[in-house]
Every structure is written in C-alpha cells, then in structure tokens.
Amino acid sequence: LRVFLGYVQLEGGGRVSTIPMDGGECSIRSGFGPGTPFFGDASEDLKVALQRLDFGAGGDADLSTVLEEARGRDGLTLWHLLSRTSGEQRARVYDRLASLKPPPATVTRQGVLALDATMLDRWWDDMRPF
C-alpha cells in the first residue's frame, strides 16, 4: 500500500499501522496484520530487514539493521516498532528514535517503554510531519 494524500490506518492481527502521505508505504500479507510502515525512499537494507521482522523469522540482527539504517524520516517506522517489540529491543528502538526525533518534555523514556498511550500520541504528534 502506498499513500499519496492524507493518512491511511490499517488494523489487523493485533497491529495498527498509520501510513502518511508523501511516500508512506506498508506491506500487507495474508495471515498477518499490517506490516510496519516505512517510506519508499528508505534504504533497501532497512526495507528487507523490516520485512523479515514483520513477516518472517527476523531477529536482533534485523532490528540492528533497521536501527542503523534509520534516518530522521524513518521515525515513522521506529515509532511503530515501539509497540511491536519488548524488553531490551524496545529500549534500543526508543534510544534510536529519541536520537533522531527527540521526544517532547512531557514524554518520558519510562512512559514510552511502558507503552503509555498518551505519551506515545504526544510524541507522534510532535514528530510530524516526517
């Protein structure tokens, strides 16, 4: 799915993906919920690793690739990965996202790692447009 105007929100399999305009994309596979959104101009390495994380046997090496390849605009992808990871992986995602798109003062690391919906929404609103 590619979005050229507005936003599209996909839900399924316990996942929610919000895909913005200006090149936002999201893979969809039968038997899974929507994949993690990304921008079409992201690196091929990031996109391949993300596909493995979403639909295959992806692991720490794939997450490391996504984190290393992420640019500021890829905050979209990293923000979605917060709710799709746990423990140390979520902490790594938070740290990389915070380095690219610092959270507002009202958003704490502890709150985000606990998936506090209010804090996640504040950060989402603060980082747009991507």
Question: Where are the regions a protein language model picked out?
Answer:
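Conserved hydrophobic register position within alpha-solenoid helical repeats
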Residues: 62-67, 74, 93
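Short, polar/charged, low-complexity connector loops/linkers at domain or secondary-structure junctions
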Residues: 1-61
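Long, helix-rich interaction regions
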Residues: 85-130
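Extracytoplasmic/secreted envelope proteins and their assembly/folding machinery
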Residues: 5-7, 75, 79, 94
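Flexible loop/turn segments at the boundaries of HEAT repeats in alpha-solenoid HEAT proteins
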Residues: 13-16, 66-67, 104-109
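Ankyrin-repeat helical core positions
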Residues: 54, 67-71, 82-83, 98
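Amphipathic alpha-helical scaffolding segments comprising HEAT/armadillo-like alpha-solenoid repeats
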Residues: 73-79, 105-110
